[in-house]
């Protein structure tokens, strides 16, 4: 699906931008603890953005379950990386419970991708 190529490219682009912003704009403003959180958010956004690109490239050749995997990864980025960016910038922990939800969405998304691929290949 073209939407996952677009979402993947946008997330990869944003991960590069937020990584550069963190390295050059936030390094003197955030403690090491919160810089580490910021870096984790950018890293996971990049990995899963690349995953979205792959899903976009293969989605026309496999089952509809691949689309589910794409949406799970996308919302995983929103919840996981989004809550970590918020935490790093504000030090407000109120969204801390959302971060693991994003992680679970990542795990389920990758699992759905494996299952969809096995069904298609089988």
Swiss-Prot record:
Membrane-spanning ranges: 3-23, 46-66, 69-89, 98-118
Q: Which InterPro entries match?
A: DUF423 (IPR006696)
Q: Does the record carry Membrane as a key word?
A: yes
Keyword annotations: Cell membrane, Membrane, Transmembrane, Transmembrane helix
GO CC, one annotated term:
plasma membrane
Cystine pairs? none
Main location as per UniProt? membrane
Q: Where in the cell is it found?
A: Cell membrane
Q: What Pfam family is a match for this entry?
A: DUF423
Source organism superkingdom: Bacteria
UniProt topology in membrane: Multi-pass membrane protein
Please give the family membership noted in the entry.
Belongs to the UPF0382 family.
- Please report the name of this protein according to its UniProt entry: UPF0382 membrane protein SE_0353
What organism, scientifically named, is this protein from? Staphylococcus epidermidis (strain ATCC 12228 / FDA PCI 1200)
Q: What is the lineage of its organism?
A: Bacteria, Bacillati, Bacillota, Bacilli, Bacillales
């Amino acid at each position: 699906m073209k939407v996952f190529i677009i979402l993947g490219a946008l997330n990869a682009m944003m991960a590069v931008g937020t990584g550069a912003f963190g390295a050059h704009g936030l390094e003197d403003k955030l403690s090491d603890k919160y810089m580490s959180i910021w870096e984790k958010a950018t890293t996971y956004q990049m990995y899963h953005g690349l995953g979205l690109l792959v899903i976009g490239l293969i989605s026309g050749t496999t089952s509809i379950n691949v689309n589910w995997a794409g949406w799970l990864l996308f919302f995983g980025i929103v919840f996981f990386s989004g809550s970590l960016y918020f935490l790093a910038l504000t030090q407000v922990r109120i969204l801390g419970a959302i971060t693991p939800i994003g992680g679970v969405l990542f795990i389920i998304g990758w699992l759905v991708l494996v299952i969809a691929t096995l069904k298609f290949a089988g």
